[in-house]
A protein has these predicted regions:
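Short S/T/G/P-rich N-terminal loop/turn motif that feeds into the first structured element of a domain
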Residues: 1-212
Length: 212
C-alpha cells in the first residue's frame, strides 16, 4: 500500500455524505499540503460503507504534524467535505513492512484492511507478525505495514493489502485472524476496521495525481 520511503504518515478515517468531493478538495489544497511537508497523499474508499473514506498523507518530517492538526485549513477542509464530527487521526511512522509482490513500489490495486489499535506489547506484536509471514502469503496478502504512533509506542496502525475482496473476506472471516490481529480495532476512541479500495494518489510537488 505504502512503499518504504513513505515512512511518516498522517491518516484520517471519516464518513462524509459524498466521498467524491474528497479528491477535488485535496487537489485544490496541494500548495497548503506541500507547505506542511507532505509529499504524497493516498485516498481509499470503503467497500463496506459508501460514506467512509480513509486518507493517508505521507510527510517529510514529524515536525509539521502538530502544526497541521492545529491549522485552520485542516478544520476547514473537513467542513468543506461535510464531516460533522472531527475524525479519528493517526500520526506515526513505519516500523515494520513485508511485501509479497514483485514490485513493492507499485501502486496498490487490491483491497486494504486497516486497523488502528493499542497493543499491550508492541515488540511482541511485531515479532508475532514476522513469525506469521507464511500465513499472510498463503491467504493472498500482498503487503503488510505496521506504523507506530508518534505519541504512544503502544498505538499502532496495522495495514494489509490483499488481491481482491474475496481474499479479504476469507482472511477476515478466519477466527484466529480476527481474534489475534483485529480484536482491539474499533475499541474506545478508535474507528472500526477499515476495508476499502485504493482510489487516488497525489505526488506533491510534481503536479501529478493518479486514480483508479
Amino acid at each position: 500500500m505504502i512503499p518504504e520511503t513513505y515512512s511518516l504518515v498522517l491518516t484520517t478515517d471519516y464518513r462524509v455524505p459524498d466521498p467524491t468531493r474528497v479528491w477535488p478538495l485535496l487537489q485544490r489544497r496541494r500548495d497548503g499540503l506541500a507547505a506542511l511537508g507532505a509529499h504524497h497523499v493516498f485516498v481509499y474508499t470503503s467497500t463496506t460503507d459508501p460514506e467512509r473514506v480513509l486518507v493517508t498523507i505521507a510527510l517529510e518530517t514529524r515536525e509539521p504534524v502538530a502544526e497541521l492538526l492545529r491549522s485552520r485549513a485542516f478544520i476547514e477542509w473537513f467542513d468543506a467535505v461535510g464531516v460533522e464530527d472531527l475524525p479519528a487521526v493517526f500520526a506515526g511512522e513505519l516500523i515494520e513492512q513485508f511485501d509479497f509482490v514483485a514490485d513493492p513500489t507499485a501502486a496498490p490495486t487490491g483491497i486494504v484492511v486497516v486497523g488502528i489499535m493499542v497493543v499491550d506489547d508492541a515488540p511482541l506484536f511485531r515479532a508475532q507478525v514476522r513469525e506469521t509471514q507464511d500465513l499472510f502469503l498463503k491467504a493472498g496478502v500482498r503487503r503488510v505495514r505496521i506504523f507506530e504512533a508518534f505519541d504512544d509506542p503502544r498505538e499502532v496502525m496495522f495495514l494489509h493489502e490483499l488481491s481482491d475482496e474475496v481474499s479479504a473476506g476469507r482472511w477476515l472471516n478466519r477466527p484466529d485472524v480476527a481474534a489475534e490481529w483485529f480484536s482491539d480495532a474499533g475499541v474506545g476512541a478508535y474507528p472500526p476496521l477499515f476495508i476499502g479500495r485504493f482510489a487516488h494518489m497525489m505526488r506533491i510537488g510534481d503536479g501529478n495525481g493518479t486514480g483508479s
